[in-house]
Structure formats: structure tokens, C-alpha cells
Design a protein with these regions (language model features):
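Conserved binding/recognition cores within well-folded domains
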Residues: 1-93, 97
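Phosphate- and divalent-cation-binding pockets in alpha/beta enzyme and binding domains
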Residues: 107-108
Length: 113
């Protein structure tokens, strides 16, 4: 299912079958080996898909990629602090901190405009 060309939900497969995770519930996305962890409501849902594929399915007005291994929901970012060398530390509403990489500094700087 898509909305404006972007995913509205993720289909998660596990040993018991399939279930859905609405994109509206997703807090962040992290690379996890050959999988991507879709984190929603404190639960990690593993998806066997490349990070760049998942990124293309998410609305860039709602999610920003800040590192090769991390994407975060923009509305849940509470603080951005420069760390030097083009890196930033982003603090989310739940207190979790994610450090951006230099490769994604422009994406973080756009958040600050």
C-alpha cells in the first residue's frame, strides 16, 4: 500500500506468518547485518531488505537518513548538536541519541534551516 508513492505500512514476515506495521508507528530504521530493523513502539521488526530500498519507500518529508546505518523520523528529533568534523548528534524525544556521519551532513543541515 502506498500514499503519494510512499509506503503506508510494512509487511513483516516471521515464523508464525505475516503482520503489518504502519509507517506512522515507525520511530527509526537501523541496519542490522543482512536485515533492516524497523523500530516502532519500542519493538524491533526485522525486514530482509537493503537500507536504500527501504529509504526509497519512506517519505523524505517524514524521515531523514543521517548515517549509512540509520534513518530517523524527523518529528521525533528534539535536539541536534554539532560534534565536529561534519558530524552531528541527534537526540530523539525518547532520549535515544544517534550520531550522523559526514556523508549525510547535508541531510542534517537541511533540518536546521
Amino acid at each position: 500500500m502506498t500514499f503519494n508513492g510512499f509506503a503506508k505500512r510494512f509487511v513483516i514476515r516471521d515464523a508464525e506468518g505475516m503482520y503489518f506495521v504502519p509507517v506512522a508507528d515507525v520511530d527509526r530504521v537501523e541496519a542490522d547485518g543482512d536485515y533492516v530493523a524497523v523500530i516502532a513502539g519500542g519493538r524491533h521488526h526485522l525486514v530482509r531488505q537493503a537500507m536504500h530500498v527501504l529509504e526509497s519507500r519512506l517519505d523524505p518529508a517524514e524521515f531523514v537518513r543521517v548515517h549509512r546505518s540509520h534513518m530517523v523520523r524527523i518529528e521525533r528529533i528534539r535536539r541536534v548538536e554539532p560534534c565536529g568534523h561534519g558530524e552531528y548528534e541527534l537526540t530523539r524525544a525518547d532520549g535515544i541519541r544517534v550520531t550522523s556521519s559526514r556523508s549525510y551532513r547535508e541531510q542534517v543541515r537541511r533540518l536546521l534551516r
